[in-house]
């Protein structure tokens, strides 16, 4: 930044507060746990913890894949077509972002009852509900950024609608879709409130952390939190790197 760019320096200073506010808790939880490595070592080999983390990773991944399967086509329709009720559909898609987590759990339980109670389907249903807006909105924005003239040229050259989509539209929107999928996965693996209501079992890492904190206190729950944060950050950074690498290729 230029020395005379006072506005940029002022904004950087204000932004630094938010960076520190987010980064400090991450830094502190690792520092605190470093003084209790024995507890971390025990937690790393605890079968219950291992199973709960596996459940979290599995269900978050499944919900993200389902979100891509159903969300990308919806994003395309919202980007390319005009129809009655479009604004309502877009508002409806954003609704899970503003609904309290516990209310999400109650809504899903009222709707699907025993079909999702205390099973993997319930966990996936919750994660899909809260994370799908990220995929739909990112897909819509990605498709909106694709020049429709490119699709028109492909069609005039004899390509079918489906071939045009997979050879022209999707490749040009893939980075936005991938970014949305990453955010959806992150949102899914962070969900706990609705899962507590819908599917306490099979236990996810989020639920186990809450259980340990309520029953045994901060010291018992902290190692699990450290492990989950480490895995989540590693996956998140790796996926972001892949997307960035593909964008720069």
Curated annotation (Swiss-Prot):
The keyword Membrane applies. The gene is wtpB. The complex is composed of two ATP-binding proteins (WtpC), two transmembrane proteins (WtpB) and a solute-binding protein (WtpA). It is found in: Cell membrane. The chain crosses the membrane at residues 11-31, 57-77, 97-117, 119-139, 180-200, 224-244. InterPro entries: MetI-like, MetI-like_sf, Mo/W_ABC_Transporter_Permease. GO terms for biological process: transmembrane transport. Residues 32-56, 118, 201-223 are extracellular. It is a multi-pass membrane protein. Belongs to the binding-protein-dependent transport system permease family. GO terms for cellular component: plasma membrane. It comes from the Archaea. Residues 1-10, 78-96, 140-179, 245-249 are cytoplasmic. This is Molybdate/tungstate transport system permease protein WtpB. Keywords: Cell membrane, Membrane, Molybdenum, Transmembrane, Transmembrane helix, Transport. Residues 53-239 form the ABC transmembrane type-1 domain. PANTHER family: MOLYBDENUM TRANSPORT SYSTEM PERMEASE PROTEIN MODB. Part of the ABC transporter complex WtpABC involved in molybdate/tungstate import. Probably responsible for the translocation of the substrate across the membrane.
